Every structure is written in C-alpha cells, then in structure tokens.
C-alpha cells in the first residue's frame, strides 16, 4: 500500500485486488443474469457495473481503510462496530439461501447475530467474537478475509446476495425530495428529475462512496431558480446541468457506454408547452423500478 493513502488506517491488513465485475464477457453475462433474476432493471445494472469499475469485483476485499473490512463489487463495509452494509449482504444470503450461507461462511466461523452484528470464531483462540472485536479479528487475520475472497469467486448465491443488498442499500432513485416551485413546496422522487443512465450513475457514485445524496435537493432548487422553472417538466430539461453539479469521482457525462441527458435549452427558450400540470406524470424514469425494497466510507 502507498505510505500516504487517503484512507489508510491500520499498520497491517489485506488488499485483495481483482478486475471489476464486468471485465470479461462471461463475467459481464453472469452479472447481467444476477441483476435480471433479482428483478432489477438494465439501467440499474449498467449504473452498478460502472461504479464497480471504481470499487472491485465480487471477490475484492481489503481491510486497510476507514470502512474497516470492505468486501465485494461495491465494497460493502463492516464499519468499526461490525454493523455496516456488509451485514445486510450477509443477512440476505443467510435468509434467501441458508444452505449456501452455511457453506460459504458459517463453516468457517463467520456469522451474523439476530440484531445485525458480524460474529467470527477467532482462528487462533477459538473464541467467539462479536461486533467490534470480530471486526478487529478479521483485520488482524487474513484467513478470515480469505473466506470472503473464496465466496466472491465461487459462490453464485453470495454474488446474488451482493446484488440484492447493493440495490436495497444504495439505490438513490426512489428517494423523495421536496423542491420549491413558484414558491410552493413540491414533493417528487429523484427519478422524476434524473432519468439518463449517466445521471443515475452519477448519483449512485455519491450514494455508494459518501453514503447519501443530501446535496441533491439544494442543487436542483438552485438550478430551477436560476432558469425560472415552474414545473417538474421544466426542471427535467436541465438534467445535464444538475448531473454536472452532482459529479463526484468520475464525469459520467463523458461515458460513451451510458445514455446521456439532452443538452439544456438555449437560455430564454424554455417552452411554454412544458409548463403543464405534472399530476399523473407519465415521464417517470425508466429506472424507477417495480418496487423492490428500494461510505463517507466510515466512509460509509
């Protein structure tokens, strides 16, 4: 590891680096199948796959930063107390595929408690450790990290659990926000405003790495006010400007493999035809999925 790494926290640890989940055609096909079986849209798959290129693949594991133990294709974390997003993925597999969970984790001494904390059997002492003590044990003993690497490489059920948990924890498009339009509060979903693949991926990047998109309503209100927007249809025309303002790690507006928002109208040319009632909006995002439930990475 570099001596001065932005999130470096521990004098020892593991950094299991592997290619992103969509590097080869076979991996890409498997990832697509996992998202399809989970009932998650192709737009969501493309967004998560783009972020995976910044995070890792299903087997990627590291224990050196403020997430403490970071695992998988979008780097789920334990956090210091052993109750972070990784536990959501473990619970998903344990609930949906108990036999696979027993094979992947329980037989190696890794489990989760009923109140959502990770537990491990210390390979050195045989003691059962819970929460913060379990996290420290994983950081200190690479053999426990190896369990996650092995499951990420060979277990289709663990990969599927990662996909489902990632969507449940990090999908930002169904969140409700309140905007000020013509001086009146208007409640809408994020997907009523951002509908392009590049825009969705930009927001997902923030949600995964920062844990939230709390700046989004302020950005939208500022841009809406600057352009005199009175309806959601007006605001939608400025999606590209909104997405540019929400950029985080990567400028996805330059990604040729993602659908892009339209250029905004020339200043002063906002169509009066757009100023119609948005009740019964038919223009809802194609990425607003049929309702499935849905860092700073201490950071998350």
Where are the language model's segments positioned?
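Cell-wall glycan-active module
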Residues: 1-300
